[in-house]
């Protein structure tokens, strides 16, 4: 059982992170998919960050040096977008800016899997996926070709996440009924969030964007910043669902709640535990 | 006048189709336009289907064999997207997976009209458009070049729809004040829906996506599955409008209502008639 | 102090413009960024206009001659989109159709700044940006390379806007706490709107789209039509914020309010002053 003081520590850390995002309004570059651009941008704005959906390879040398952190999401990947993603990721890594890889639907093609493995070579700070995506990536990173099974629950993905974290050097975040965050040694569970959030497209991408904003303001504590972002997004979803009649109103209330989230609510609702 | 037993048959068919979509959660690949990706995905999710917005030509050989059905929408067509659409459509036809063509704004250019005619050669299961689009396609299929007049009501388009259905082998669905579905012989009218739905961008595209999901779970009864999808979408719009203050809240309530639609409401509200 | 009769003149002008948009439903072509396509289209629909998100360079010769006005927004510019923007802008100028340039994030790269300067050569009717964007463009138009500082308030941008208007021949609109519209001589302030609108992505792009619709129905009075569009959008935002719990519900209510805006409300709320 989690000690009360440790739970309090997580809670106050989450609130400190959210406050810092609101105060510093980090500039977050997103190279994300077409489906999620709108919701990712609105998620970041409602959290207090400054999103910039800049994806042209010709703009990266000028723009990426000015950002605080980067999000790369392969959800609607085509070959012409990959050079931009690589250029931005490489530059971010060189300049020691944190960046997150969201390997959305990584198993849908050999092309996409290969692209994600190449992006992992560029040293993402965090890899954020669902259970199936993390299992597929972890297997492929070990040279295995077993396909992903989308029925994997995130808790089943713990070993895959730890393995991927060890081999890649990234913190790995797995969204699911219980969100998992691991650096390969520690395993943290985030129990916030609701099932209906999965009925809204682009919530996973938006969570990845939010993690980027939190990394931007605490890049030395990657595991903790990632946990904080997942807890904040989950709490906004819980509050939103209490007001919602279905997924579309949940989507609206989630963003409103993220915007209005206050200290009392955060401290009361953060539900984070050590799983290993 | 429609017999009561025939109306009951349509109603119970609509409910059976919706239930099957929810239970089977078919995987629906959408190659659609930039404007509609978000709403199409959320419409499919709220109906219980699994949308996948995969459009890269390099991913189609790996991915399309795993889908249950395909949606192709030319709303923001550029020459570089057409090969993907053709490759996916051709593969879907080969593998006997149903696919829907939405010839959005087909008359806006010679390029787009030609592209749609080429796609029709690949044997769509259903062609879904508004009256103007269907009239333009039907004329062009007969070698006529008369431009479309956007003032055509869907009921005026019946003859064009029948002709296009006969020449293409597709079931043709025409959205409008009364939705029309025809296989070239039978003509069915779907009287559900509200006028304000036309004030929301991408509702037509979302309806096309929904038809795909319904075809996925009953591909042997194309006419009936198409009617069911149109009735369900229309009913969700009616329920949504009763709660809405304008098009943006209608959009939200429509998705929520689609998600929550129950048997009693479906059986009571389905309004389908034989027109010929 | 503004005379009451002058204020009344602005108010009745705004209402006359909105009424004309609703009655004439102008066809507005938008070549805009991926993030904003959905909201721009819904803004135009809710105002009574007909949006068409047609951006392929191969479609412009067929399509652009039929439009009433054009919107060009560089928010997610890549080199392959620029020829379309130029072709459409050039054709619009040739055919004396009004067009608006939204130089979104113009300072994010040398490529984007150069593209905007080239587009300005094609004689936009209106250039709409925030203070930083207008200052950056104005400096660059004078051959200066000083970067934009995003902390500039729109009122600080008056001189830059006047200078850009004089050099380009366009009316320049600057969104901010007080919106500014100038033809280089007259300077008009629009005091409608709320701060929270900046927490929603694509509101600036949507305002640009709305200006296009208003130009379409009164192309001979560019300054006045631009002021009207900004006042209408601002009023919709004020009404929306009164009903909102955060940015996502504001976004919904804004569109609903734009759709339902009536004469009494417009006449009462328009807040326009001469600043110079």
From Swiss-Prot, chains A, B, C:
Keywords: ATP-binding, Kinase, Magnesium, Metal-binding, Nucleotide-binding, Thiamine biosynthesis, Transferase. It is an enzyme of class 2 (transferase). One of its GO terms (biological process) is thiamine biosynthetic process. Pathway: Cofactor biosynthesis; thiamine diphosphate biosynthesis; 4-methyl-5-(2-phosphoethyl)-thiazole from 5-(2-hydroxyethyl)-4-methylthiazole: step 1/1. Substrate binds at residues 53, 202. Disruption phenotype: No visible phenotype. It catalyses: 5-(2-hydroxyethyl)-4-methylthiazole + ATP = 4-methyl-5-(2-phosphooxyethyl)-thiazole + ADP + H(+). Induction: Not regulated by thiamine or 4-methyl-5-(2-phosphonooxyethyl)thiazole. Pfam families: HK. Its cofactor is Mg(2+). CDD domains: THZ_kinase. Belongs to the Thz kinase family. Thiazole kinase involved in thiamine salvage pathway. NCBIfam families: PRK09355.1 (NF006830). This is Hydroxyethylthiazole kinase. The gene is THIM.
């Amino acid at each position: 059982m989690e000690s009360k003081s440790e739970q309090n520590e997580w809670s106050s850390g989450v609130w400190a992170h959210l406050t810092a995002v609101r105060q510093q309004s980090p500039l977050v570059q997103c190279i994300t998919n077409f489906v999620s651009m709108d919701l990712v941008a609105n998620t970041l704005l409602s959290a207090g960050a400054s999103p910039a959906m800049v994806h042209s390879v010709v703009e990266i040398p000028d723009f990426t040096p000015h950002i605080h952190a980067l999000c790369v999401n392969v959800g609607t990947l085509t070959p012409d977008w990959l050079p931009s993603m690589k250029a931005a990721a490489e530059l971010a890594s060189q300049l020691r800016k944190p960046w997150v890889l969201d390997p959305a639907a990584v198993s849908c093609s050999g092309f996409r899997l290969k692209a994600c493995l190449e992006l992992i070579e560029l040293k993402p700070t965090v890899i954020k996926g669902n259970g199936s995506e993390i299992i597929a990536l972890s297997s492929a990173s070990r040279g295995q070709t077993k396909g992903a099974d989308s029925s994997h629950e995130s808790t089943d993905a713990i070993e895959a996440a730890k393995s991927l974290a060890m081999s890649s050097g990234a913190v790995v975040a797995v969204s699911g009924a219980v969100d998992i965050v691991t650096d390969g040694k520690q395993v943290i569970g985030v129990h916030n969030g609701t099932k209906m959030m999965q009925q809204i497209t682009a919530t996973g991408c938006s969570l990845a964007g939010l993690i980027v904003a939190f990394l931007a303001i605490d890049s030395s504590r990657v595991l903790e910043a990632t946990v904080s972002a997942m807890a904040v997004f989950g709490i906004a979803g819980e509050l939103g669902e209490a007001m919602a009649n279905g997924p579309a109103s949940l989507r609206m209330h989630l963003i409103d709640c993220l915007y209005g989230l206050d200290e009392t609510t955060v401290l009361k609702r953060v539900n984070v535990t050590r799983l290993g």
